[in-house]
Amino acid sequence: MAKPVKYDEEEEEVSSSGEEEEEQSDGAGSGSGEEEDEEEEEAPAAAAGEAAGGEEEEVDEEEIEAVTTGAGADEEEEESGAAAAAPGEGDEESQSTEDDEAVVGEDDDADEAEGGAVVGKREKARLKEMQKLKKQKIQEILDTQNAAVDADMNNKGKGRLKYLLQQTEIFAHFAKGNQSKEKKPRGRGRHASKMTEEEEDEEYLKEEEDALAGSGGTRLLSQPSCIKGKMRDYQLAGLNWLIRLYENGINGILADEMGLGKTLQTISLLGYLHEFRGITGPHMVVAPKSTLGNWIKEIQRFCPILRAVKFLGNPEERNHIRENLLQPGKFDVCVTSFEMAIKEKTTLKRFSWRYIIIDEAHRIKNENSLLSKTMRIYNTNYRLLITGTPLQNNLHELWSLLNFLLPEIFSSAETFDEWFQISGENDQQEVVQQLHKVLRPFLLRRLKSDVEKGLPPKKETILKVGMSQMQKQYYRALLQKDLEVINAGGERKRLLNIAMQLRKCCNHPYLFQGAEPGPPYTTGEHLVENAGKMVLLDKLLPKLKDRDSRVLIFSQMTRLLDILEDYLMYRGYQYCRIDGNTGGEDRDASIEAFNKPGSEKFVFLLSTRAGGLGINLATADVVVLYDSDWNPQADLQAQDRAHRIGQKKEVQVFRFCTEYTIEEKVIERAYKKLALDALVIQQGRLAEQKTVNKDDLLQMVRFGAEMVFSSKDSTITDEDIDRIIAKGEETTAELDAKMKKFTEDAIKFKMDDTAELYDFDDDKEENKLDFKKLVSDNWIEPPRRERKRNYSESEYFKQALRQGAPAKPREPRIPRMPHLHDFQFFNNQRLNELYEKEVRYLMQANQKKDTIDGEDEDQLEPLTAEEQEEKEQLLEEGFATWTRRDFNTFIRACEKYGRNDIRSIAAEMEGKTEEEVQRYAKVFKERYKELSDYDRIIKNIERGEARISRKDEIMRAIGKKLDRYKNPWLELKIQYGQNKGKFYNEECDRFMLCMVHKLGYGNWDELKAAFRMSPLFRFDWFVKSRTTQELARRCDTLIRLVEKENQEYDEQERQARKDKRMAKNMTPTKRSALRVSEGETTPSNSFKRRRQSLMDDYVGSGRRKRG
């Protein structure tokens, strides 16, 4: 089998060790994992040829790589290029050979053009044939692979039903129902049901063989050797369970609790199939987009022998993966997202998959969803569902999962519902027991408390805090706004909206538009003081920092994460952040930065829904739930980001709660729902209620209203954080005791009373509360409505516009502070001081008496004339006309041309004169450190200037080399050393250097076009088919050779000049003594050395004159 060919442009020699590694890889293509030098180029067609199993000659494989890379898409371009090259050949050739004695006649030109066209057509035909053969080989591999998968699929179904019947007799009902629909084979009259003796003996023998095979199923005592690291005992047991399912042809659900290593168990199953069964795939993993990076890393970490491909990206990236990586024989595992599984189903349907693995499988519990329908159309041997969320005992959801796992048995939802139909309340426990019997062969679920004894415990504490004055003001206004709905009980949708607004107020009042003071919007203590939870967080974080803890902060609201981000920057804490808008690469980079050893990141901000899935953040030991989710499982998933395998410390969970508000009821309901879910599974009751009803919402909204209206002052205390935590532990203990009593009481209730289980308080004070009276007592009287007597529009406008009407005195308008950006380089500090002074004075002058208290305030002074003049001067000093777009254009121009090339930068700027740009550049140079991200900006500019400097060095080096020749296009020589290129000849390298000197370094598209249009390379398909990236790499190799040659040449010239000066100043006596010391005893040697020295001097002087 031919080895993959590697082109080496600098060394031009393949080491023997590299060849051995390539032999071991056996043409695995992209999955080999071998590292290559920067100058090495691998021929993908050669690797594809090996994967196809063809044993063609090495030259043919190289030609496939050299010719087919761009010819398929650019065939018309090739034809037009070839047609254009032929007529223009005579002109260019005559110009380049003006001094030659031989002149080609017209007849010879015509013959040559005709011969070139024939050769070109022949080459194109051969190219098409080679492309056709390549596609045929790939299709043959795909057909062979799919046929093997289909054969296994037919074999695996034979013993499946028998295995299921051994587990429970329930499957006999569904099997009979299915078999009854099938057509019975025609028999032999009344003897049709009887078997012959030979058939009976054959069946008995087969049953005995199956029994022996079943009794001797595979059970691993140690993990497969291809799995790196050490698997725990329960993980090995999970692998054996998955192997048993595989051997019996059964699909399954791996439902271990979050953090127990479901990903590792799944990867170990694929490793087992690879090592022991010789099954390399293809397998497909479908997971949430946010977890794809983690899947790839885990596969590379635990089972590097598997070749994994991440199928994700924009259309161009997906097209590259589809054509180069997602090919038969080039990958083992395809990892993709739910969205890609739907969007790219045409591509993925080509394959027959060995395993389809669905992570976070609760997404397919609705059989009518697009994802569920799409996953059912893929052809696969096995399906494995992974979920950390416990399954609810809902009949239809369970049928949907069973239908996905075993569609040929659980084909009808009606039959399933009829079989499990409940005739009375006493039968419910029996029905659920039967359901669990059905699920038992497919489902494996284990809890941390049962299997992971070495995992440190998790302790949850509810920290209650009061509200600030601003929070109370907004909370009270929200209740007054929807008085009718809250008092009488309106629609559930309106109540949900009120509940959401109240929860926003509990989190931070700045979530409401206009609540934050500004503009200008500044980060200061007001960010902390105006929200009770922020005061609590500000006390908690320093304590956690002192004891070297690391913190995860979860919130449901992305805008709240913005506020927390401002706070962390204000306090100087280093942090990472992930929410629903974070891209995949940024997400992986943030997780890696937080988890790396010695990381200085103290806080990780995450949204509960986007950041609570598939992330391992076990390096943190504190979880702060800034707000609680309606679904308690979401909060549990968030906690398990830290409380999982690899955690070495006790995990502390702090759940923030605003006292006497809706949040207390939300948390209480979450605790009740967790207890009730456990009770449902224990008692065998069918879970029906999933959403909060209208009555529950009404009670939550009304809760704490009396406390809010009774006082307008802040209820935030100055207690020490240790005291707050101690009180929180007491509160949590009380709530746990209440939940225990709730569970005991709930056991006595019937299923009809399930809705009332959430309301177990004997004294429902919020129902007894006269909410309307409470609000009316604290009502702020709105202004009186004024009834207009005149209803005529014309008369109204006449009166309104009458000249003699007395005009009301208008109150002076409070000036608005302009939004000042950091790139405009204003003196923000001084301007803010002047504006605040002016605004305070005007507000005091126009403010009416408030009813809260009538204390006399100190009289404020307006701006003096000097201060007013100073303010106007400061506004003129900045660059108010420069927008963010202008600033970004200026930065890009600095990166492109350098900071000193003002003329080129000004040419890039639209609407700015050169003088304006020069003034801005001067200020930017002096005050760039005032920018918020100046480090990144300066690094980018310096990187661009370094590229410019390097480009100038390269052009000087090439110019210096070319200046040593009269006609470098014909005479240029390159000192390759020992390793000369095998595929790029000297003529090609000479043309490349001359064209780069003419076109400029970096213009690779123009260089590629020059190669294609040049008659010198009309039939050199290797050169004409090179991409711009390959030409750039070759050019870089030649530049390094030229720079090395220039350095040696400069050294020789310096040595020649030094020897010449020494010879000029040396006397005859010294010369003879030097000759004796150097061993020049014979006159002939002395004569030869002098002659060589003179020749070197002559050549050096001639070169300098030409230079």
Curated annotation (Swiss-Prot):
Q: Which GO terms label this protein's molecular function in UniProt?
A: ATP binding; chromatin binding; DNA binding; helicase activity; hydrolase activity; nucleosome array spacer activity; nucleosome binding
Which stretch carries the motif DEAH box?
A: 359-362
Superkingdom of the source? Eukaryota
**Alphabetical GO biological process terms:** positive regulation of transcription by RNA polymerase II
Q: Which residues form the Helicase C-terminal domain?
A: 536-687
Q: Does the keyword Endoplasmic reticulum apply?
A: no
Where it sits in the cell: the answer is:
Nucleus
Q: Which PROSITE patterns match?
A: HELICASE_ATP_BIND_1 (PS51192), HELICASE_CTER (PS51194), SANT (PS51293)
**What's the protein called, per UniProt?**
Probable chromatin-remodeling complex ATPase chain
Q: Which family does it belong to?
A: Belongs to the SNF2/RAD54 helicase family. ISWI subfamily.
Basic residues composition bias: residue spans: 183-193
Please state the protein's primary subcellular location.
nucleus
Q: Where is the signal peptide?
A: none
